[in-house]
Curated annotation (Swiss-Prot):
Encoding gene (name): ndhG
Compartments, as annotated in UniProt: Plastid, Chloroplast thylakoid membrane
E.C. no: 7.1.1.-
Highest rank taxon of the organism: Eukaryota
Enzyme class: translocase
Keywords, sorted A to Z: Chloroplast, Membrane, NAD, NADP, Plastid, Plastoquinone, Quinone, Thylakoid, Translocase, Transmembrane, Transmembrane helix, Transport
Homology family: Belongs to the complex I subunit 6 family.
Membrane-related topology note: Multi-pass membrane protein
Protein name: NAD(P)H-quinone oxidoreductase subunit 6, chloroplastic
Function field: NDH shuttles electrons from NAD(P)H:plastoquinone, via FMN and iron-sulfur (Fe-S) centers, to quinones in the photosynthetic chain and possibly in a chloroplast respiratory chain. The immediate electron acceptor for the enzyme in this species is believed to be plastoquinone. Couples the redox reaction to proton translocation, and thus conserves the redox energy in a proton gradient.
Length: 180
């Protein structure tokens, strides 16, 4: 998607000023919430720079990953840690902790066993037929989608499992009631 040069000139100055003021806000604001919101402004400005450079997928990934995940995670962590109802001491080891440890260890061992027993040679043979399919794809987003569903399927699924575990952990922490 090509844009006329005059659009670049109109967008460059306000984006640059927003980026500079947002960066100054990240460093100089004393309230951590305002600082995190200022970081969100900086990341949005960077994604607009990617759009100007015709890197649409990178811009969307910037918004989803850095603003939608990392910045929100920072805000949640700050809000949870500033809550006075959660004490700073660690609770003793409980039965639920040992059950969770056993389940996590068994899942880890089964994943390692599956990874070691997969025939990786057969997967590399399917990549040659995928290269023929890749020539028919027209834009970068379609090519990245094809790579995520073929070449990088295992890391993509592992990341989704890690995000699911992080989400469950955040919900558990948020729902925990004071037991003192």
């Amino acid at each position: 998607m090509n844009r006329p040069e005059s659009i670049y000139d109109l967008l460059l100055a306000p984006l640059t000023l927003s980026l500079i003021f947002g960066g100054i806000g990240v460093v100089l604001l004393t309230n951590i919430i305002y600082s995190a919101l200022s970081l969100g402004l900086v990341l949005i400005c960077i994604s607009f720079f990617y759009i100007i450079l015709n890197a649409d997928f990178v811009a969307v990934a910037q918004i989803l990953i850095y603003i939608g995940a990392v910045n929100i995670l920072i805000l949640f962590a700050v809000m949870l840690m500033n809550n006075p109802k959660y004490p700073n001491y660690a609770p003793p080891w409980t039965v639920g902790d040992s059950i969770s440890s056993i389940v996590c260890t068994s899942l880890f061992c089964s994943l390692i066993t599956i990874i070691l027993n997969i025939s990786w040679f057969g997967i590399s043979l399917t990549q040659k037929s995928d290269q023929m399919l890749e020539r028919d794809l027209t834009n970068n987003i379609q090519r990245i989608g094809a790579h995520l569903s073929t070449d990088f399927f295992l890391p993509f699924e592992l990341i989704s499992i890690i995000l699911l575990v992080a989400l469950i952990g955040a919900i558990t922490i948020a729902r925990r009631e004071e037991t003192v």
